[in-house]
Structure formats: C-alpha cells, structure tokens
Amino acid sequence: MRRTRRPRFVLMNKMDDLNLHYRFLNWRRRIREIREVRAFRYQERFKHILVDGDTLSYHGNSGEVGCYVASRPLTKDSNYFEVSIVDSGVRGTIAVGLVPQYYSLDHQPGWLPDSVAYHADDGKLYNGRAKGRQFGSKCNSGDRIGCGIEPVSFDVQTAQIFFTKNGKRVGSTIMPMSPDGLFPAVGMHSLGEEVRLHLNAELGREDDSVMMVDSYEDEWGRLHDVRVCGTLLEYLGKGKSIVDVGLAQARHPLSTRSHYFEVEIVDPGEKCYIALGLARKDYPKNRHPGWSRGSVAYHADDGKIFHGSGVGDPFEPRCYKGDIMGCGIMFPRDYILDSEGDSDDSCDTVILSPTARAARNVRNVMYLHQEGEEEEEEEEEEEDGEEIEPEHEGRKVVVFFTRNGKIIGKKDAVVPSGGFFPTIGMLSCGEKVKVDLHPLSG
C-alpha cells in the first residue's frame, strides 16, 4: 500500500501557527510584567507621614523629617496641585513643592538637588539646597499653598515652576525637567502638622472675579479653619472633637445701619454642625458660637438656641441643605451708640433681600418698642480669668433669628463692649455656607 505524502505547505502552516501561539503567550506575559512594573513605579511614597485619604499628618518623633511624594508626576494636562494647611502644628515647618521620583524621604522637599519647595514657616524658596531665599510670606492654618508647572515647559524640558498662596501667584523659578517628571511633594517637621492634599486642583484665572473674592475676604475680621471663596465659607478643620471649631467673624459689628445678616446652607457636611449668631470681638476661636460668654447663636443641627452656655434651649426645627438662617438685632430707641459713629438716619425704611422678601414682618423690627416688656434674666457662664461685664440699661437689645425669611424667635441680650459681631461656626467635615452680611437695603 502506497503512503500518501503530506503536503509540505501544510506542515509549514502548522509551524507558523505554533510560533504565533508562543509569540502571543510571550506578548501576554510581557504585558503583565509591564503592568506590574508600572504598578510598582506609580506608587505614592511617604515616611513619618500618616496618610488618611487626602489628609496628611506628621507621624514622627521631634527632629525627624516627614516627607510625602505623590504617585504620579505633573503633566501638561494636570500641571498644578494645592495643599491646604489644616493645622500648622508646633513650628509650622510645612514644605510644598516638586521632587524627582525617587527623592530621599529623609529630607524636606527643596533641600536636595533637582527639587524645589516653598516653606511655610519662613516663606522662603528652597531650590536644591538647604539654604533658602526669601520668596513670599509665611503661611499658617487655613492658608493654601499651590505649586505648578507652566504648560509650555513640557515641550522644552525646562521646568518653569510657579507657586501660589491662597490662589494668588507668589513667584516662579526655573529648573531642569527630570526624565521621569517632577512629582508633587509635601514635607513636615514638627508635631501636630496636618494638611489636606488637592492633586486635581485648578488655578483660576486672575480676573475681576478674583478682585471680588478679595473684597469679600476683607469683610472678615477673623477666620479660623475656614476658607473664603467669594461669599462661600468652607470648613477646613478636623471635625473630630468639640474643639475643632471653624470660626468666621465679620470685621464690623451689627449697628443701627446694618443690623441683620443671613447664611444659606450649601452643604450640611457630615453632621450639619452649623451655628449662626453674634459674639464679642475676642470670642474664643475653638468655641462654637453661643457656647461661651458674650455670644448667642442658633444651631442648625438641633434647632436650639445657645446663649453663653453649652446647654441649649429648644427653639425651632432643625435646618437642612438649602435653608436660609438669619440673625439680627432690634435696637431700643434709647440705645447707647458706641464711638463708631452709628446713626439711625437711614434706618426708617428697611427692605429685605429677595431671598427673604416674604418676611415682611422683619422690615421694621430694627427698633424695639419699650412698652412694659419684661426682660428675661440670662445666666451667663463665667470663663476662667474673665469677668462678667455689668449690664447697662442702654445696651440691652433683642436678638432675633429667622428661618427662610420668617422670624422664628427672639432672645434678650446685652451688647458687649465693642459690639456684637456676626459670627458663624462649623464643626463637621464638608460643611459649606453662603453668607450675605448685607441682605437689607434702604
């Protein structure tokens, strides 16, 4: 029997298929190896730093440098990042800048070659050496430090690096672009330091809106763990205990010419621990409005009013997202004006803002008619080292509160020396409010 000879081209095709199969397996293995290398390559690195989401806090012994390096470098499409200082700690030795990928974590950013950083404690720029040059102002809790690379730098491989403070450019410097890119870095060097990292931050254009933001910032006399962005206030504190209060106090007290203000709850955050009220000028920054002497406030989370005490009285329903809380003063006709030159010439006609136009009964409540109304006696807590200010008949007023344009209640109070300042407190993460310090006109 004659054997049939298998065609040669069939054997060749099978060999080609086998080679293709092995090439495919090698290709898959190579892809897996590349992914593993990239996964290892793009990992955030840190030492003596505790990382909790986007929050970084110092976690070393005194004298040890803490350093954090982000997992990916800045790019042409993502060329800017920011760091918000939550707590400046003991010395405020916080550094923000750019470093090579494998930068030594035992040194502050900017101390070693091919790195640059803006240091908060002295306002100096450190560019590859342990000695800095004067660059900008010092930074404290509540400040934001930004760092970026001009987009054109990615085409010429020479990095033009700029820094910002609270959204405003401080200055710039030039350094060679590292082959692997320049990575966002944060350094810390003392106990208690804590920051919030914003790797996807965007730098707004410096136009008329920035000038408007500046004018709004000027309206605030004190800001603690609160960020101002136009009319918006954002809580920046830890929100972990009752002393982590974020406080915003207006620069000027309420007067017969400006006796009312409003707050809209934009974001209630985790707990809606938002308080609106009035307080003396030297009110403690770590006490919620209403908790300590010389203050009275309406709290959104429980609908209670607090008047110089940590125990509140039932007042009205709670407030939620979108609600507008208001606070004002009804002045008696015989009110004794402070030396600020307050006058009641323009206060006979009061018109509410559109958001509270339904509250027509607020229109003429600036003056309190004294017709035998009984004054409630409020017991005020005496804080350590402070004396209760004696009541003065000519400085007794009625503080009133509104909810969505309607008066919901009143509280008798004595105006402290210097006046009652609009004060807003926040105490849980994510809280944001929109403030109108001058909702009335006329």
UniProtKB/Swiss-Prot annotation:
PANTHER family: RAN BINDING PROTEIN 9-RELATED
Domain B30.2/SPRY: 17-204
Acidic residues composition-biased segments: 372-390
Gene from which this protein is expressed: SPRYD3
Protein known as: SPRY domain-containing protein 3
UniProt region (Disordered), positions on chain: 371-394
SUPFAM superfamilies from the UniProt entry: Concanavalin A-like lectins/glucanases
Pfam name, any one: SPRY
Database matches in PROSITE patterns: B302_SPRY (PS50188)
